[in-house]
Each structure stands twice: as structure tokens, then as C-alpha cells.
């Protein structure tokens, strides 16, 4: 798992080894529910977590160790291959999570700087620039919140962003080397590789200059919420591109299912349909940080409530670059907004089944299973009158439940209008 890797800025195009390593597919092998984490560590720890050439680590709860002059991603690669070798020798099922910091920004104290590549990669891609997509350095009609007042980027700012982008690509080359080392170890044990699932992903997306934003990751735009996710292993079709929406709440349920481990009721997510028998099922999208995405073959919407209590509604079939705050859908906009607001309220503090099946949580009678069902005029009063709205009393620097307004919706048909229990 990389740190803050984009999809829409094309960083994967500069990682041929990572892409090639996930081209193939291993045959089916027996599953085993007794998987173990072979060892614990090393773990990158502050103050050197995001320092590329003086990382601070702890191994198996031992003493802290600094590694001046050693490149962080290479340290992670060497330890990972060592752990993998130990796990293979043990002859037992294992789980290995590998999390280099690239392409995260270099962070020393409060300073936020461009990523630092390994010396061997620092002269690559010198002519590459941030992709000049239609949203680059462009405002958006109808934008709200701080997007509304962002000034046009100056030439020196754009030059800095191009340099920042190149440094991200350069730092990812050591990740490619890491993947190559891990694959070489697995390929030297074909029987292990044939029964091992591999995943490549990131924790966040990233933007650089889109909508006039400086480098960052905390917005609800496509660049931030879409991330790489590549899977390889028994039963996963080679070269297949899945179009179903998922989130990282689905990762653990997916791993459990592939390993033959029973799922837990408290899981917020559900297994991804990575194999053919699941890919025919509809998958529900969940996004619970005040931005909601509903995505199907027939319609796709993004609905956002800002801490200023301003609202955005985008028809993503019409414009997936957020060029205007509007929709051309046949749905009535006020009625649609009311449904989406209630769905967002259901998800903003959900847990367990409420995260996986929000419509069924709202309508336990089972007569509403999606947005089209919810748009029935018979439910107008329920959505427009009975429901509280997603609101904020003020803008906070972080999550503060006291300013979040209502945390859960009213359930349809509940005599006492009892709301679902929110996550604490």
C-alpha cells in the first residue's frame, strides 16, 4: 500500500514493474482459514515516519532505530523480503502488509516538502509535467466552500507543482523496485505464488493544481477519492477491469472471504466481487465524510454538504470533472437532494449493516432498495418532513461530534421515530 498515490494524474503509467507484476493470474488453490501474521514490524514511527533518508523504525516492539543515509523505501523492501522468506520457510499461511511512504510528501516537523526520490532515480522524468486536464487551474461554476474563492495559479506556483509531481513519480520508482524484489522471491517458490493473493493500493488519492488547489488529498474531488487498486491471485481473471464502486472498508471483508474466514457482523464493508461469481452482484457505494457518491449504470451523483451548510449536487454522467454544480437528470432536483441528504445522514456515522445496506436500514420493511425506489412520491413526506438534515453548527479543524448536527436518520415506520444508533 503506497501513501497518497493518485489514479487521475497517471502515476501508474510510470510504474511498469508494478503493472506487469499484476498482469498474470495464479490458478485456484485450496483456501485456509488459519492465516497468521508471521512477524510484527518493522513499523515506521514519528518523528521520522515521512523522512525519506533518516527513517525511524521499531521492530517487534524493540528499541527505536534511526537509519541516516538509508532510503526509507529500500529499508521497507529489504525487511519485507526477509519476512516473506521467513514465512515461506515456516510453511504456514501468512499475511504480509507492506506500506512504504512514497509518494507522500517529505514531512519534518511542520514542514511539508516534495517527496525525495532515491539517488538512482532523481534524474528521471525531468520533462514531465502535471497532466493539464480540463480542471487544472480552472474554477468551477457554482462552486461552494473554499473552492469558490481560490485564485488562479501563478506561473511560479505551476512550476513548483510540476516539480512536486516529478518528485512523486521519481519516489515511486523505488516502490517499483520493491514490487520486483517481492515478486522475485515469490516466483522462486511457484507453489507459494500459485496460492497467494497480492493487492496493490493506496490510502488516499491526490490532487496537484486541479480546481486551483495546491498539492493535497483531503477534498471530495475525483483525484482524491479514486485510488489505485489492483489484485492478483487464485480465481481473479487476468486483465479484467472491474467497474464496481468499493472503499477501503471492504478490504478486510475481502481478505476474510478469500481466506475462508467467516465475516463479522461489525464489518462496515463487504467483500469486493473480485471473482466471477460475485461480479454479477450489485455493489453499493459508501462514502461517509460528508460527500456521498451514488454510482450505477443508469445514473451517478455526487452530493456534498459543507461545514458552511452549503450544498453541491453533481451529475457525474454529465460532467465527472466537476465543471458545474448542477444536474441534467430526469429526477426532480429538490426531491433528489432530499433523498441523497438522508442517505448521507445514514452513512455519516454508520456502523455494521447500516454502512453496507443503508436503504434497507432506512426502510426495514424492504420496499426501498435503491434510489429509484426512494424517489417514489409516496415517500416525499418521509424525506422532506420527517428527516433531519445533514448540518453543521460551525467549521472545525477536525472531527468534532458536537458541531456535526444530527448523526443518524429517522427509520421509516418507526412509531417513536427512533433514529439508528450512530458510531461513537
Swiss-Prot record:
Signal peptide: none annotated. CDD domains: G6S (cd16147). Ca(2+) binds at residues 13, 203-204. InterPro entries: Alkaline_phosphatase_core_sf, Sulfatase_N. Keywords: Calcium, Hydrolase, Metal-binding. Its EC number is 3.1.6.-. GO terms for molecular function: glycosaminoglycan binding; metal ion binding; N-acetylglucosamine-6-sulfatase activity. It is an enzyme of class 3 (hydrolase). Its cofactor is Ca(2+). Binds 1 Ca(2+) ion per subunit. It comes from the Eukaryota. Belongs to the sulfatase family. Sulfatase; part of the gene cluster that mediates the biosynthesis of pyrrolopyrazines, secondary metabolites showing insecticidal activity. The role of ppz1 within the pathway has still to be determined. The single multifunctional NRPS ppzA is sufficient to produce peramine via condensation of 1-pyrroline-5-carboxylate and arginine, N-methylation of the alpha-amino group of arginine and reduction of the thioester and the cyclization to form an iminium ion resulting in release from the peptide synthetase. This is Sulfatase ppz1. The gene is ppz1.
Amino acid at each position: 500500500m503506497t501513501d497518497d498515490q493518485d489514479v487521475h494524474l497517471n502515476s501508474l503509467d510510470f510504474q511498469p514493474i508494478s503493472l506487469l507484476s499484476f498482469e498474470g493470474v495464479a490458478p485456484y488453490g485450496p483456501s485456509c482459514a488459519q492465516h497468521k501474521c508471521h512477524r510484527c514490524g518493522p513499523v515506521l514511527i514519528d518523528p521520522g515516519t515521512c523522512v525519506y533518508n533518516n527513517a525511524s523504525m521499531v521492530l517487534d516492539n524493540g528499541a527505536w532505530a534511526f537509519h541516516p543515509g538509508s532510503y526509507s523505501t529500500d529499508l521497507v523492501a529489504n525487511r519485507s523480503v526477509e519476512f516473506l522468506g521467513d514465512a515461506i520457510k515456516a510453511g504456514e499461511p501468512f499475511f504480509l502488509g507492506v506500506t512504504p511512504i512514497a509518494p507522500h510528501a517529505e514531512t519534518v516537523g511542520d514542514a511539508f516538502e516534495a517527496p525525495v526520490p532515491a539517488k538512482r532515480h532523481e534524474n528521471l522524468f525531468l520533462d514531465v509535467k502535471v497532466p493539464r486536464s480540463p480542471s487544472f487551474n480552472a474554477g468551477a461554476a457554482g462552486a461552494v466552500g473554499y473552492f469558490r474563492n481560490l485564485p488562479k495559479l501563478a506561473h511560479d506556483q505551476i512550476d513548483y507543482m510540476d516539480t512536486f509531481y516529478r518528485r512523486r513519480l521519481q519516489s515511486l520508482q523505488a516502490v517499483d523496485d520493491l514490487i520486483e524484489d517481492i515478486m522475485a522471491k515469490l516466483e522462486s517458490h511457484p507453489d507459494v505464488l500459485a496460492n497467494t493473493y497480492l493487492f496493490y493500493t493506496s490510502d488516499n488519492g491526490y490532487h496537484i493544481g486541479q480546481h486551483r488547489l495546491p498539492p493535497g488529498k483531503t477534498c471530495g474531488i475525483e483525484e482524491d477519492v479514486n485510488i489505485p487498486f489492483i489484485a492478483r491471485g487464485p480465481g481473479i481473471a487476468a486483465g479484467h477491469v472491474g467497474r464496481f464502486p468499493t472503499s477501503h472498508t471492504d478490504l478486510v471483508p475481502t481478505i476474510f472471504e478469500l481466506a475462508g474466514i467467516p465475516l463479522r457482523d461489525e464489518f462496515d464493508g463487504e467483500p469486493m466481487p473480485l471473482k466471477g461469481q460475485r461480479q454479477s452482484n450489485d455493489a453499493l457505494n459508501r462514502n461517509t465524510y460528508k460527500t456521498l457518491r451514488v454510482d450505477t449504470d443508469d445514473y451517478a451523483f455526487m452530493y456534498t454538504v459543507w461545514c458552511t451548510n452549503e450544498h453541491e449536487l453533481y451529475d457525474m454522467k454529465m460532467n465527472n470533472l466537476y465543471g458545474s454544480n448542477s444536474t441534467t437528470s430526469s429526477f426532480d432536483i429538490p426531491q433528489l437532494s432530499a433523498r441523497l441528504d438522508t442517505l448521507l445522514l445514514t452513512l455519516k456515522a454508520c456502523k455494521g449493516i447500516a454502512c453496507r445496506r443503508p436503504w434497507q436500514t432506512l426502510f426495514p420493511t424492504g420496499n426501498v432498495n435503491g434510489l429509484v425506489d426512494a424517489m417514489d412520491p409516496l415517500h416525499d413526506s418521509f424525506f422532506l418532513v420527517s428527516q433531519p438534515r445533514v448540518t453543521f453548527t460551525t467549521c472545525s479543524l477536525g472531527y468534532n461530534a458536537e458541531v456535526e448536527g444530527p448523526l443518524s436518520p429517522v427509520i421509516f415506520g418507526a412509531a417513536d421515530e427512533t433514529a439508528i444508533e450512530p458510531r461513537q
